[in-house]
Amino acid sequence: MGKKAVHFGGGNIGRGFVGEFLHESDYEVVFVDVMDSIIDALQGASSYKVTEVSNEGEHTKTVTNYRAINSKHNLDQVISEISTADVVTCAVGPNILKFIAPPIAKGIDARTIERPLAVVACENAIGATDTLHKFVKENTDPSRVESLSSRARFANSAIDRIVPTQDPDSGLDVKIEKFYEWVVEKTPFGEWGHPDIQAILWVDNLDPYIERKLYTVNTGHATAAYYGYNMGKKTIYESMSDEKIRGHVRDALSETSTLIVDKYGIPAQEQRKYVDAIVARISNPHLEDVVERVGRAPLRKLGRKERFVGPASQLAERGKKVDALLGAMEQALRFQNVLEDDESFELAKILKTESAEDATAKLTGLESDHPLFARVVERVAKVQKGPK
């Protein structure tokens, strides 16, 4: 019997990153989603194309050997597929993990295969698989929780690949950056060994990879988006072509680099090279990306462990400079009432109805005695006063 992977999330990352590499590693991929349009399209086509874009041009691959299930209508089938799968992955967004946990828990509980299921969440969030693991445990019969590790092993991952705005007529086909990084911790698999997925770099300690990626790629990308949005730019390329915005991005990444170098002992020169590569990637004209898309979900992006507050809070605790990160946070706070982005409307409401202190606590999760708190309050109060 061939290898099988169940993947939650039929979106661009699911099809164009995770699905592509599972296919190339000879897995049959079972896509699971609640969106009728995506599932209907996947069920109606025997293949789709992934076009990798770089400065050297484009290269197209074809993905086949997949099926698709609508979990809204066929949850029992999803559970059955998980019970016989080798791997479960997801790219659904951190806020959706709690909704996919019940069928995963049921599928794991129904397993009779000796080898434990490998579960890897592919989300832009620190410890996303740990979060999913917690939800799975909450949805497992208490008498079966202790033996859960005999049926499934959960490993955190760090993913890095830019998916630009897609052509509205592209259907299932995905245009995606050629560069990628998919790093997964191997320790949880213990004596069983990790699953065979060629694209993955398996490591003992994931923390440096997760924070370096989140606090460089995501911090840089979001900084360009928020400054660009507030300065009337349409795309990230346009934003990064503006010397002022490029300088703001560089300054923010200089601060996050201080943290990465100090905390993990990564050589400063190596981190500088990494930053240069990231700045070049997000400035790529072939990956033209709309600022509203990159900036969407500002509430999540202003969160405690996220791309701004995460590094800034740790730097403040170390007594280091955070001016550029505070500037980027201020721009994120100004990302309000953006069409088709519910969080931007909620952000506007919070800033209108709450005091600066209460809004800061609610948005960032910072404690009032944290060394960063008062400095964020200043920025929140400034934004509440209106346009800069």
Curated annotation (Swiss-Prot):
Residue numbers binding NAD(+): 5-16
Reactions it catalyzes: D-mannitol 1-phosphate + NAD(+) = beta-D-fructose 6-phosphate + NADH + H(+)
One Pfam family from the record: Mannitol_dh_C
Active-site residues per Swiss-Prot or TrEMBL entry: 213
E.C. designation(s): 1.1.1.17
Single Gene Ontology MF annotation: mannitol-1-phosphate 5-dehydrogenase activity
Highest taxon above the source species: Eukaryota
Keyword presence, NAD: yes
Keyword NAD belongs to the record: yes
Protein's job: Catalyzes the NAD(H)-dependent interconversion of D-fructose 6-phosphate and D-mannitol 1-phosphate in the mannitol metabolic pathway.
Family, similarity comment: Belongs to the mannitol dehydrogenase family.
Name of the protein in question: Mannitol-1-phosphate 5-dehydrogenase
Gene source species: Coccidioides immitis (strain RS) (Valley fever fungus)
Taxonomic placement: Eukaryota, Fungi, Dikarya, Ascomycota, Pezizomycotina
